[in-house]
Amino acid sequence: AFVGCIQLGAWTPFTLLVFKSEFSYLHPAMYNFLFWSHLAMVVQAFVIHRYSDLRIRASALAVGWYLLNDVVDYFVPVVGTAHHTRLPAEPVVDGAVRHVAPAHEYAAAGAVVLTVVATFLVVATRAEKLRAELDATGEGSA
């Protein structure tokens, strides 16, 4: 959940900002709801870490899942074209979404960077939690 909250919680606001003019059809209340509710997911990740152990195996599985998701969504589609959420900047031609440049690349770059950031944060948060546990027991070094 930690990795997903960061990756998905930050990707939507990123996309809303990068393609702001394309999302202008949204009512301002809906735009703000989508933006802020997804950013709240990033905050939620740091609430989750308070009660989760962020075990290495579970963290590795989550990171692997989101990396696979990025690969399938943007680079190596399983069936047809890329599978990521359709962006208003990508036209539908003859019933099929055309993943045009640079919209597709911007969305892909955002997703991959956020997966890397989430990976760093899960590892760093786990390390800090372990350090705090060791310090609390007197086994850690300053």
Regions found by a protein language model. Name each.
Residues A1-F19:
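Small-polar-interrupted transmembrane alpha-helices in polytopic inner-membrane proteins
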Residues F2-Q7, A58-N69:
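Central hydrophobic cores of alpha-helical transmembrane segments
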Residues F23-W36:
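Non-cytosolic membrane-interface motifs at loop->transmembrane helix junctions
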Residues F33-M41, V113:
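Membrane-embedded alpha-helical segments of multi-pass membrane proteins
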Residues L39-I56:
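Alpha-helical transmembrane segments in multipass membrane proteins, preferentially the mid-helix core
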Residues P77-T81, T85-A124:
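Membrane-interface transmembrane-helix boundary segments in multi-pass integral membrane proteins
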Residues L121-E139:
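Membrane-interface capping segments at transmembrane-helix boundaries
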